[in-house]
Amino acid sequence: MLTRLSNIADQINGPMIFITATSLVMLIGITAAMVYFTFRYHRRRNPHPEDIHGHRVLEIVWTVVPTILAFGFFWYGWQGYRYIKSPPPDALQIDVTGRMWSWNHTYANGVESPELYIPVNQAVKLNLHSQDVIHSYYIPAFKVKQDAVPNVPGLFLWFEAYQTGIYQVFCAEYCGMSHSAMWSKVHVVTADEFNTWLETEGAKVAQMKKAAESGDDGGNLHILGEALSKSKGCTACHSTDGSKLIGPSYKGIYGKTETVVTAGQERQVTVDDAYIKHSMLKPTDDIVKGYQPLMPSQEGLVSEAEIKALTAYIKSLQ
């Protein structure tokens, strides 16, 4: 509970220990006084108790002392709050987007990942966004948590991890049917390992864009699409093995005739490139029968190159 895996942990542990210790001392003192007074002023010892109409010193003491303690709690917490809300200007900036029901991490060079990769002993600032409802980005090991609210800019959290390893990320705000499955991981690695990972993933992004724009994918565009489906959180709702999740499975869907509900009317459509693209950009227009219209629009969130890569991946799952 008091592990020191990040700089923010110090700002949380200190006030918690102070408040807990103070409360414990007060609990013991008040309980001891109650027990003492119970015996000391028992009816058998004081058959005719004296009425006390006021005691100015006592009233001042039990007003002033708790007030000082309350201000002490506030001051201690305020110092930590100021620190938590003051990231260093050279912190590594990463955009984090929450959506039902996955996280996406976007780096400055365009790399996207469903899991967070950061270097050890370096300040990291996570700029939080939400595509749909309120989510909350929570890393228990580092004692950091911040809500991501739709259409509210400027939300962030920052920290500096002190130890390499893999840590859990959770959504700490109930966000619907698969809220409990909205978790991810933080990979804390050395600076060299982080730079290598970022360069490698950046090369994949450049390759995907080039292949999609030229139309010559060398047979590898579906591989890039597979990685993209994970980073975009597609696989949180669409399985690749035929099993039913929140949305239709990708397996065997390309070229299939599906029954969809359009403006309240059922009709037949063939799943092709145009249908897949339209379903990404305007997912509530044609709802596959038997499913709910839960998918948010990806318009402005996926590029033409990414749509082509995702389509190639879906095609490959026959």
What feature does the model see in each segment?
Residues 1-25:
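Hydrophobic alpha-helical segments
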Residues 160, 183-191, 226, 236-282, ...:
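Gly/Gly-Pro-rich "capping" loops immediately C-terminal to redox-active cysteine motifs
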Residues 195-201, 206, 293-318:
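C-terminal capping alpha-helices of c-type cytochrome domains
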